[in-house]
Amino acid sequence: MEIQAALKKLIDRQDLSTEDMTDVMQQIMTGQATPAQIGGFLIALRMKGETIDEITGAARVMRSLATPVSVKGDLTNLVDTCGTGGDGSGLFNVSTAAAFVAAAAGAKVAKHGNRSVSSKTGSADLLETAGVNLSIPPEATARAIEDIGVGFLFAPSHHSAMKHAIGPRKEMGVRTIFNVLGPITNPAGVKKQVIGVFDQSLCRPICEALQRLGSEHVLVVHSDDGLDEFSLSAPTLVVELFKGKITEYRVSPEDVGLESQSMDSLKVNDSEESLTLIKQALDNHALDRTQGRTQRRKGFDDNGRISDADADAHFAQIDAAGQLIAFNAGAAIYAADLAQSLAEGVVLAQDAIGSGLALAKLHELASFTHLLMEDQS
């Protein structure tokens, strides 16, 4: 089907078949459609609402045109934590931090991601701030996943065909089907994922699309307080694909041994603040409460010794960050089939944080990417 004909159908609020959507996406991704046609199509599709058939067809085209990352060895526990972003919460990079915790717990993590579009900091922004070189070839990314347990798949490096849609997307400045496609077009071909989405209505369609695309274990989530993550301050809707069946349920922090609490202190302004909080959370959980407070009280500010109240507030912030990371990492560990339940996954995540291995994985990936580029120069 030609894009003009598809556009007419969408204007009449008619759904496209998987085959029709495949035809149109091929035209968009191979430069056969004009910017005006692309923009009109994306807006008309958004206004009608994307169906499972349309998401599936579009994802198949993006996957077929992606530059692959061929991970060798046992892929039983290969998982991704990439979400849609765009929830507007301003929180630190939770899913990226969770990726390193899952790797420390034994998963192989192919973390797909990009720079920030609407949030304070994207996964690529955070990792670049942490010293990770984003400009490594696909075979090097595969080696990082194999040897370290985690690698970063920088979306622009693997989805070059997206260049044809970048202009219209930026000029329109609204969410389109491409915001949904990113998490379901991982170049490493993962079949196990945790996907946070910006709108609860997307949970079921994305899960069903992934079922058609051959995924094995997937958790698509959106919290009742609007996060594209598991939340500490409200129940989270989970649409889970496992063993060919899809189930829906809600999870509260107490269900997995955590505490419900405010997350206002977990908002950041940029990647520097996000990285600092993540490092503190992953490092602090190797300490107990008393030791952590004792160490912080050795510091001074302009008015003298830091107060107990300030120390307690700082500890509470780091503790909340650690719990939020453990919640989401636990889901990744469960999706990777390293735990029998989400609650068990959270326990394994807490162990990985407490051991210091999660923070070590972050440093290891940064060192690996830079040593690799030095060897090639």
Task: State what each model feature region is.
Residues 11, 42-46, 80-85, 332-335:
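Short glycine-rich or small-residue beta-strand-to-loop segments that form or flank ligand, phosphate
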Residues 1-2, 10-56, 63-73, 324:
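N-terminal glycine-rich anion-binding loops that anchor highly charged ligand groups
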Residues 49-111:
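Active-site cofactor/substrate anionic-group-binding motifs, chiefly glycine-
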Residues 13, 31, 83-90, 283:
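Short, glycine-rich nucleotide/cofactor-binding loops
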Residues 40, 97-101, 324, 328-331:
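Short amphipathic alpha-helical face segments that pack within enzyme cores
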Residues 19, 42, 92-148:
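A glycine-rich phosphate/pyrophosphate-binding beta-strand-loop-alpha-helix module
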Residues 83-88, 113-119, 158, 224-225, ...:
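Acidic, glycine-rich active-site loops and adjacent beta-strand->loop/helix elements
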Residues 9, 64-67, 91, 106, ...:
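Glycine-rich anion-binding loops and their surrounding alpha/beta cores
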